[in-house]
């Protein structure tokens, strides 16, 4: 391995300040295929007036409702979705972020909409009343979320005077929209913080720095001028005498630090990286070897103005908090003297991370000035941080006794074996390897996935995303990223899959926290679609491999690397499948499947596969999804106010293309949610007749232009096309099929959808009521 990996030179960065005071970062990277904007406002939930909890979060929601210039059908969210991009926002304790990513051709129009919605919000009382109900639905879901409850219990150990102990989510009762005092507070907060001097904007993409600067000057000038507002300092994190509130030490250890110096964010990122390293001789490996934990993850729960809450999240096997704390503090003392030896490896890892980052990640990185190295100032901050991280900084914990009773022989992690010096223009590739099993084996999959976890992290650091998934009777390994380390990564993965550790499966991983209902349904959608009978599970991995068949699909490999890959794949367990993959059978009619949930909320997914796997049907189904995405959201979320989780789009499962609709609601039953979705689908013909189809086809077709598609998205489309029996140039075939569609043919497709010609699968958090007819609807 080379001693030092050169920093990638493809990205150029320029920082400027506009005349109105807006701070702008411009990032050009020639390898990018999309462009992104990330805008941060230095104000968050803790800056809102105490009398109106949730005001900052509420305001974030209001911006997305459209402006006088860009109404609901043309606002930022609708525009980005129509062009196949991504858009979101987030309100944190002291910051609020708005961001989107789009193809380069649509980026300027997206930026125009972002700046317009923040500079000229409509904020009518009618809009506020409607959006308050959405926020209230979000609040109900948040209140029932296990992770949210866990965090509330964790923060109970913090000083009651600190804003972290306050209520900031906002709901129907804290947001008194008709009250003139609330309206004045909303306007005051907006005018105080949503001005240029309080904002930072980053634009990233393949455009030249000059082009990006022109865009920033044109649209950033919309913001009102102002002066930087100093956000008020919070109370101390720790109350003296120490709080009597004890946290669950089987799940968390919490450190509170104060008065950390500049660049403490670099120090925290550096420390957390090495705390979370799972290599032998480190903290995690030692705790697992001793049977004390299943997993550990260190992350900053809160950082602002020199304060830090460092959360050590645990999955402990047994009551062993005292031993775990002793070993943690022992490792910190070891790290205090040894960390300088890890700086070079850390710089290499961060360089590789940025080298592989997409447009949106780069925009976030430079907008938020996230750490990517340990500078001299960062090293000074790390020394101070490690001085504070003693037993005295633990809050909500019992005193630590016998600090030296369970010491370990610590050692530094070995360098990443896949992190070799790679040329700046190293190409990307993708590999898909799928096994078909006689029946689903969730327990064995969990054991193997746990075994792959350290490799997944090493591969990620080297620029390769490795996932091991299970759906239906299939197991699948997927690799995306830099081509150079990919063969070595798959060799290591196959070795771990073939030679799993013997013995019982009791340590195959700990059950994860329950998901909100709609996420739970999404997680198991493919299983409900593919599995029609009870699985015959076994603990005999050798037998499972013996009776499995596998296929592979690769893209982006040159002749030499393809030869190396083929040699590596010869070690794949199971039998290579020589015939073409079999598509899941079409099941006519509508069938209801339930996925039990303990939540009081209800959720429903409706998956509607195309009747055939032809390119023509896929193109028509994709155009339907494109047309209905914004109207579906408008109808169910805005007009009917069913809940905050409302979405639709294309979903592909094992080569089958289908429309997917999803809703979660705190007020409607599963039956009612399905009926709302069904009613919307029934109105599709009217929507098609009023649509500007040539323009919609043009916009959708542009999304399949290789110049606009990230490499992983291209690879995913071609993998699904391979499973469906199609071969090369599938994107171009889709574009041709789209160009042949017109109102008449799309109406015929809509009628196929309404008639459930490809079947409908309804997956819900509750069983179907006898009152819900699942026969074909009348048209």
From Swiss-Prot:
GO terms for molecular function: metalloendopeptidase activity; zinc ion binding. Pathway: Cofactor biosynthesis; pyrroloquinoline quinone biosynthesis. The active site is at residue 60. Its EC number is 3.4.24.-. Its cofactor is Zn(2+). Binds 1 zinc ion per subunit. GO terms for biological process: proteolysis; pyrroloquinoline quinone biosynthetic process. Keywords: Hydrolase, Metal-binding, Metalloprotease, PQQ biosynthesis, Protease, Zinc. Signal peptide: none annotated. Zn(2+) binds at residues 57, 61, 138. It is an enzyme of class 3 (hydrolase). InterPro entries: Metalloenz_LuxS/M16 (IPR011249), Pept_M16_N (IPR011765), Pept_M16_Zn_BS (IPR001431), Peptidase_M16 (IPR050626), Peptidase_M16_C (IPR007863), PQQ_synth_PqqF (IPR011844), PqqF-like_C_4 (IPR054734), PqqF_C_3 (IPR054733). One of its GO terms (cellular component) is cytoplasm. PANTHER family: INSULIN-DEGRADING ENZYME-RELATED (PTHR43690:SF18), NARDILYSIN (PTHR43690). Required for coenzyme pyrroloquinoline quinone (PQQ) biosynthesis. It is thought that this protein is a protease that cleaves peptides bond in a small peptide (gene pqqA), providing the glutamate and tyrosine residues which are necessary for the synthesis of PQQ. This is Coenzyme PQQ synthesis protein F.
């Amino acid at each position: 391995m080379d001693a030092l990996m050169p920093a990638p030179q493809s990205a150029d960065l320029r920082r400027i300040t506009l005349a109105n005071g807006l701070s702008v970062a411009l990032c050009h990277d020639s390898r990018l295929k999309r462009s992104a904007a990330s805008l941060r406002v230095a104000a968050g939930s803790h800056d809102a007036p105490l009398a109106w909890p949730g005001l900052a979060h509420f305001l974030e929601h209001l911006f997305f409702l459209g402006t006088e210039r860009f109404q609901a059908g043309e606002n930022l969210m609708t525009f980005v979705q129509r062009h196949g991009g991504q858009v979101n926002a987030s309100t944190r304790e002291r910051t609020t972020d708005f961001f989107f990513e789009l193809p380069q051709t649509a980026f300027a129009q997206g930026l125009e909409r972002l700046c317009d919605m923040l500079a000229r919000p409509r904020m009518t009382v009618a809009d506020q009343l409607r959006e308050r109900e959405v926020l209230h639905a979000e609040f109900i879901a948040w209140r029932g979320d296990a992770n949210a409850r866990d965090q509330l219990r964790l923060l109970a150990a913090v000083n009651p005077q600190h804003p972290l102990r306050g209520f900031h989510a906002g709901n129907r009762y804290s947001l008194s929209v008709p009250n003139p005092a609330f309206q004045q507070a909303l306007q005051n907060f907006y005018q105080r913080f949503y001005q240029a001097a309080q904002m930072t904007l980053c634009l990233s993409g393949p455009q030249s720095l000059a082009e990006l600067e022109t865009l920033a000057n044109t649209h950033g000038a919309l913001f009102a001028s102002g002066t930087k507002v100093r956000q008020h300092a919070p109370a101390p994190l720790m109350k003296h005498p120490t709080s009597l509130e004890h946290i669950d030490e089987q799940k968390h250890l919490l450190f509170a630090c104060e008065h950390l110096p500049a660049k403490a964010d670099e120090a925290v990122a550096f420390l957390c990286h090495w705390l979370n390293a799972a290599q032998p001789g480190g903290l995690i490996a030692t705790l697992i070897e001793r049977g004390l934990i299943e997993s550990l993850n260190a992350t900053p729960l809160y950082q602002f103005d020199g304060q830090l809450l460092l959360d050590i999240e645990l999955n402990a096997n047994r009551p062993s908090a005292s031993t775990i704390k002793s070993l943690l503090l022992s490792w910190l003392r070891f790290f205090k003297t040894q960390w300088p030896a890890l700086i070079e490896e850390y710089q290499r890892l961060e360089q590789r991370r940025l080298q592989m980052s997409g447009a949106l990640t780069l925009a976030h990185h430079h907008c938020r000035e996230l750490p990517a190295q340990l500078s001299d100032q960062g090293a000074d901050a790390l020394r101070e941080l490690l001085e504070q991280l003693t037993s005295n900084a633990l809050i909500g914990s019992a005193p630590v006794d016998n600090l030296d009773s369970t010491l370990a022989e610590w050692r530094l992690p070995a360098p990443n074996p896949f992190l070799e010096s790679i040329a700046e223009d190293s190409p990307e590739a993708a590999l898909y390897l799928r096994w078909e099993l006689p029946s689903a084996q969730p327990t064995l999959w969990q054991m193997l996935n746990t075994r792959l976890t350290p490799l997944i992290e090493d591969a990620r650091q080297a620029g390769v995303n490795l996932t091991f998934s299970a759906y239906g009777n299939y197991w699948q390994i997927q690799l995306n990223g830099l081509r150079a380390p990919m063969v070595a990564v798959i060799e290591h993965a196959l070795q771990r899959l073939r030679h799993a550790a013997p013995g019982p499966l009791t340590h195959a991983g700990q059950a994860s926290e329950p998901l909100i209902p709609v996420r739970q349904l999404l997680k198991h959608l493919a299983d409900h679609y593919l599995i029609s009978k009870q699985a015959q599970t076994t603990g005999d991995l050798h037998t499972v491999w013996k009776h499995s068949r596998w296929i592979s699909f690769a893209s982006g490999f040159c002749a030499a690397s393809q030869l190396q890959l083929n040699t590596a794949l010869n070690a794949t367990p199971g039998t290579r499948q020589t015939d073409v993959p079999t598509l899941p059978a079409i099941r006519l009619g509508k069938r209801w499947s339930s996925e039990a949930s303990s939540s009081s909320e209800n959720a429903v997914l409706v998956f509607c596969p195309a009747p055939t796997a032809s390119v023509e049907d896929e193109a028509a189904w994709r155009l339907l999804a494109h047309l209905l995405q914004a109207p579906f959201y408008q109808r169910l979320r805005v007009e009917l106010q069913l809940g905050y989780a409302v979405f639709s789009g294309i979903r592909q499962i094992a080569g089958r293309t289908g429309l997917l609709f999803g809703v979660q609601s705190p007020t409607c039953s599963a039956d009612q949610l399905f009926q709302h979705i069904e009613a919307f689908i029934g109105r599709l013909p009217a929507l098609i007749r009023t649509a500007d189809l040539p323009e919609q086809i043009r916009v959708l077709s542009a999304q399949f232009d290789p110049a606009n598609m990230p490499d992983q998205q291209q690879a995913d489309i071609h993998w699904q096309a391979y499973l469906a029996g199609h071969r090369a140039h599938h994107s171009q075939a889709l574009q041709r099929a789209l160009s042949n569609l017109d109102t008449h043919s799309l109406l015929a497709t809509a009628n196929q959808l309404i008639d459930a010609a490809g079947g409908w699968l309804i997956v819900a958090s509750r069983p179907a009521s006898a009152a819900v007819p699942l026969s074909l609807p009348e048209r």
